Amino acid sequence: MRTDVFLQRRKRRDVLLSIIALLLLIFAIVHLVFCAGLSFQGSSSARVRRDLENASECVQPQSSEFPEGFFTVQERKDGGILIYFMIIFYMLLSVSIVCDEYFLPSLEVISERLGLSQDVAGATFMAAGSSAPELVTAFLGVFVTKGDIGVSTIMGSAVYNLLCICAACGLLSSAVGRLSCWPLFRDCVAYAISVAAVIAIISDNRVYWYDGACLLLVYGVYVAVLCFDLRISEYVMQRFSPCCWCLKPRDRDSGEQQPLVGWSDDSSLRVQRRSRNDSGIFQDDSGYSHLSLSLHGLNEISDEHKSVFSMPDHDLKRILWVLSLPVSTLLFVSVPDCRRPFWKNFYMLTFLMSAVWISAFTYVLVWMVTIVGETLGIPDTVMGMTLLAAGTSIPDTVASVMVAREGKSDMAMSNIVGSNVFDMLCLGLPWFIQTVFVDVGSPVEVNSSGLVFMSCTLLLSIIFLFLAVHINGWKLDWKLGLVCLACYILFATLSILYELGIIGNNPIRSCSD
């Protein structure tokens, strides 16, 4: 048991370090593109565009959306910024601990009790929990800051969710994952409809009560489709499988079948194979006294689960254990561990409390990253495309990579696309509450400048992702990861050139300039 826990912690550490390295690579490339764009903007051929800067509408800097730091600018430049870097690392570690120790196990128990397949679980509960920071951001934007921070944050990180997280899953997975056509098609269509609805709603810079109700209705229809996903998928496969090879059922020996391990009363280990087309991959079978398909692998939920206060044997692991002990203790006393038999019936409370802590840690993470970017003079354009987008989506990134590394590719992809669909609810719910219960009859004012480019990019990225998966043979591997990474770098390059006014003739400047 101790060896399993150490291996699990090592996997979490490897995933976290790999994600950080990938984000630093993206940040370096995007920053180089920005510097090159500034050089071109200063040339004689681009000076005419700079004359339009005074007439263009300014945007608030990212730092205006958060409280001031606990150091002055000069104190941060004199060395105080190291404290912020340590807080950033600790928040990343905290998010990974919540996801690994509480959030994903609660998702496992929920899926087991409700009989959900991998893709449905990833598109609903996993997407809702990992997108909790966006929901908090949307409520802050409507009720606290009275601005469009929710729109800018959700729309700005949407392309990152689609392309960058998919790239991370493909590049950091140890094995090739097989993808199913129907779940990806279902989620991509739902997200395309959601994006089109948001663009139509905010085109006049005002959101009324029926606009928020429309978004809630779209998400309600999406959830209803998920509830009847088995029947719908069977109909689609029977209707279109003769003309579409990707919808044809795979052989029973393929990787689509998940091994379910159960321990009977005589403690003998038995293995049963069940296709994804069955009613659920987590349902109990007669003759099994204990059944678990762990999101971290085929792990038994033991009565003697490893305590967070047990010290590791090696010195390096002891250092990491001491560093993570405060947050581990905080989570231990505030979140019930549904892996333990006593708390297993409180899995929904575990899920909700995990989402709360994920939101809190992510907010502090993005706050610290924003201050670091402001101190180092990193432009908001580069920050928004890399570190801030990654910060708000770090729960999705960690959760998706973890389940992808265990061979659950459909769950990872459904979480990637499904979390973006849930983000539409993040916009519709606070808008509906504001216009119906708070300021009755008064619309919510939003700023839709520049969203035409963003909306076109979102729709194109959805189409590109689906086509890339199809061309790659419905495999989640390093080739798909490289293609998605290159596409995201291209998107970031075009976005930077657009905001600088090099393309589009519409430079965007900060109000602090």
UniProtKB/Swiss-Prot annotation:
Disulfide feature: none
Domain of life, source organism: Eukaryota
Keywords, ordered alphabetically: Antiport, Calcium, Calcium transport, Golgi apparatus, Ion transport, Membrane, Potassium, Potassium transport, Sensory transduction, Signal, Sodium, Sodium transport, Symport, Transmembrane, Transmembrane helix, Transport
Segments in the Extracellular topological domain: 36-78, 145-148, 203-207, 337-350, 403-420, 472-482
Catalysis: reaction(s): Ca(2+)(out) + K(+)(out) + 4 Na(+)(in) = Ca(2+)(in) + K(+)(in) + 4 Na(+)(out)
Gene3D superfamilies in the record: NCX, central ion-binding region
Main location per the UniProt record: Golgi
Membrane topology field: Multi-pass membrane protein
GO-annotated molecular function: calcium channel activity; calcium, potassium:sodium antiporter activity; symporter activity
All ranges on the Cytoplasmic side of the membrane: 100-123, 170-181, 229-315, 372-381, 442-450, 504-513
Parts of the chain that traverse the membrane: 79-99, 124-144, 149-169, 182-202, 208-228, 316-336, 351-371, 382-402, 421-441, 451-471, 483-503
Tissues in which the protein is found: Highly expressed in melanin-producing cells. Colocalizes with melanin biosynthesis marker dct.
InterPro entries, alphabetized: K/Na/Ca-exchanger (IPR004481), NaCa_Exmemb (IPR004837), NCX_ion-bd_dom_sf (IPR044880)
Signal sequence coordinates: 1-35
A Gene Ontology biological process term: calcium ion transmembrane transport
Compartment(s) where it occurs, according to its Swiss-Prot or TrEMBL record: Golgi apparatus, trans-Golgi network membrane; Melanosome
A cellular component annotation (GO) from this entry: membrane
Deleted gene: phenotype: Fishes show a delayed and reduced development of pigmentation. They display a diminished number, size and density of melanosomes.
Family: Belongs to the Ca(2+):cation antiporter (CaCA) (TC 2.A.19) family. SLC24A subfamily.
Stated role: Calcium, potassium:sodium antiporter that transports 1 Ca(2+) and 1 K(+) to the melanosome in exchange for 4 cytoplasmic Na(+). Involved in pigmentation, possibly by participating in ion transport in melanosomes. Predominant sodium-calcium exchanger in melanocytes.
Cited PANTHER family: SODIUM/POTASSIUM/CALCIUM EXCHANGER, SODIUM_POTASSIUM_CALCIUM EXCHANGER 5
Designated name of the protein: Sodium/potassium/calcium exchanger 5
Recorded name of the encoding gene: slc24a5
